[in-house]
Amino acid sequence: MSYVLNWDALVDEAVRRRKTEGLTQVQLAALAGVSAPTIISFEKGDKGLSLSKAIDILAALGLTEKNSSQTAQENFVSDAFERWLKLVEALPQDHPSRFPHGFVAYDYEIEGKIPSITLSEFRTNILEKAVAPFSGWPPFWLPTRDGLRPYVVDDVVECWIGDPATNRAFTDAAHADFWRVSREGRAYLQRGFQEDSEDLPKPGTIFDLTLPIWRASEVLLHADALASALKVDSSAAINFHVKYTGLSSRQLTNWAKPDRLPFFDTHRSRTNDVALSVRASVGKVRENIASLILELLQPLYEKFDFFRLSESLVQEETRQLISNARKL
């Protein structure tokens, strides 16, 4: 037996219940923890609305029970991934912007009291200040060109640099970033692997030794910079998460730095997805970056036939990264 959800009837019942309970759309938005425009879109029957936001609205009206096991950050990440899926759904399966060989997704939440700020102030005074040039392609970069620059979706600042309809200098998966940042100190970044460049003969077959250290460090330092720009309390913390997909059958190499630690044995992953996390104190990230990254990434490297990520390697790479920022 199969069941079909009558979405229109559910929306109608939600509107009826809101009016019966004497709630305005703004009041319902506050109860559900969503924006007023989201309520308006929901009541118009917009099927493009994320499922988690629809559930928030229905739960506020007593029409469904929200899964209490999922945290606010997990909801934020789910919404972000759903948005990305919607953006790429019309693209061919092998299009680089779909990350056909896998991707890495970073997300973080700043745990602490965050002051109220307008979206315009958030973009200009916070997001722009948080971008640090540790490399030529910094995370959460804010393009200014039409078609690439950030925009607002459901009170969240969003940017998709992988839009094939826009003329871009780089069209590979590693330069097709999708990111979202909220004024509540939540962020999500999804990016393809540089190792899957179209210039290489076999995308999806190698995993670089040093690139994960640089990329994770950049995003963690961005979280600390965002917290600083938001002027959060010094007792605040950053909960940082990374998920790698498409790792199965990849071989660990020194592709980005051929002179770094030559491999005499084959180190291959039989695991496809790896999820990692670390917790850091706001204002202490830069001074502890090597130890934080070692704690975060060691379980990832172990999936490649028990490869041991050495403390000295992480210290040297993070030292170079910090030094690189001073030169750029």
How should each PLM-predicted stretch be described?
Residues 33-49:
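Recognition helix of helix-turn-helix/homeodomain-like DNA-binding domains
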Residues 70-328:
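Bergerat-fold GHKL/Histidine-kinase-like ATPase
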